[in-house]
A protein has these predicted regions:
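A structural signal for conserved, well-ordered secondary-structure elements
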Residues: 1-305
């Protein structure tokens, strides 16, 4: 016990209130950004329905010229984004209309003709086109939420059974609360960076749930072991020692993963790959949140048992 107590480097008892206050500030700031003009929740056509039309081109085309041409054909709200293939041999721009702003086949042909005439020197060609009805999008969104809820249910069952010695259901609820906060962090990241919520976001959420839960279980294992080795110690001291002894392992794992994800972010920004960006950016923030919440979330609940 004496040897383990010497391993304490950070007193999480003192930092708990500050961390919880920081959580509250981040949460309120995230909620506020939802209602700030220009930010808000932006749904991809997979969740909100609509149409995406992509064109390949050569040379350089200005966003303003694309927007002016599209406005001359479509009297609907839209966004334009550019991307370049990793090999650098294919440039595309995508016109997205979300919600009920779908585009008929006739209008797509008219738009293609207008763009071809406007950028006659840029070899404009239709790259791909995709439309999703609001009904289908709503069904996909519902199924995605159900998948996340089922995952949360299995988390409660698994953690509750495996760690019944250190709280059982209380331990499971603690882990779930930490996971919920991590999900909110990824959501607020999308709002702040004006990223569309698409199928990539669901992949991020499910990945973060598994990643953060793994960190939490590592600490729980330490708590269970140290509770047996330190029978005369207060539970707060046991938890404090457990977090510190697993801190190096979790920090190295999180840092390694974070660097890898930030590499993906850099590539997505360099080549304008929006699909990679909507995955990597919230993933990076989710990793940081998961590393913090796996320790402080456990501390906040187990210490009060």
């Amino acid at each position: 016990e004496v040897r383990k107590m010497r391993n304490i480097k950070i007193d999480f008892n003192k930092s708990l209130k500050k961390v919880l206050l920081a959580y509250a500030v981040i949460f309120l700031a995230g909620i506020a950004f939802i209602f700030i003009p220009g930010f808000g929740v932006k749904l991809d056509i997979n969740f909100g329905g609509g149409t995406k039309i992509a064109y390949s081109y050569t040379g350089d085309v200005k966003d303003a010229d694309i927007e002016d041409t599209v406005k001359g054909v479509l009297d609907k709200s839209f966004t334009v984004s550019k991307s370049t293939s990793l090999a650098g041999d294919t440039k595309t721009f995508e016109i997205a209309l979300v919600g009920k702003n779908s585009v008929s086949a006739e209008k797509q042909e008219e738009l293609t003709k207008a763009l071809t005439e406007k950028f006659s020197d840029n070899t404009i060609e239709l790259y791909n086109s995709n439309s999703v009805s609001p009904t289908v999008a709503g069904s996909f969104f519902t199924k995605s939420i159900v998948a996340v809820l089922i995952t949360a249910l299995f988390v409660i069952i698994y953690v509750g059974i495996r760690f019944r010695r250190i709280g059982g259901i209380s331990a499971a609820v603690t882990a779930l609360c930490a996971l919920v906060f991590d999900v909110f962090i990824t959501f607020f990241t999308c709002v702040f960076f004006k990223l569309q919520l698409d199928s990539n976001y669901i992949a991020v959420v499910l990945t973060i749930l598994g990643y953060s839960l793994n960190d939490t279980i590592v600490v729980y294992d330490r708590v269970r072991e140290n509770e047996r080795l330190m029978p005369d110690s207060e539970i707060s001291d046991v938890v404090n020692v457990s977090i510190n002894t697993s801190l190096k392992r979790n920090a190295i794992t999180s840092l390694t993963t974070f660097v890898a994800v930030m590499t993906i972010v850099a590539v997505s920004e360099l080549f304008g790959l929006s699909t990679l960006r909507t995955f990597a950016v919230p993933m990076a923030f989710g990793i940081v949140s998961g590393a913090v919440s796996s320790g402080e979330g456990i501390k906040s609940t187990i210490s009060s048992m």
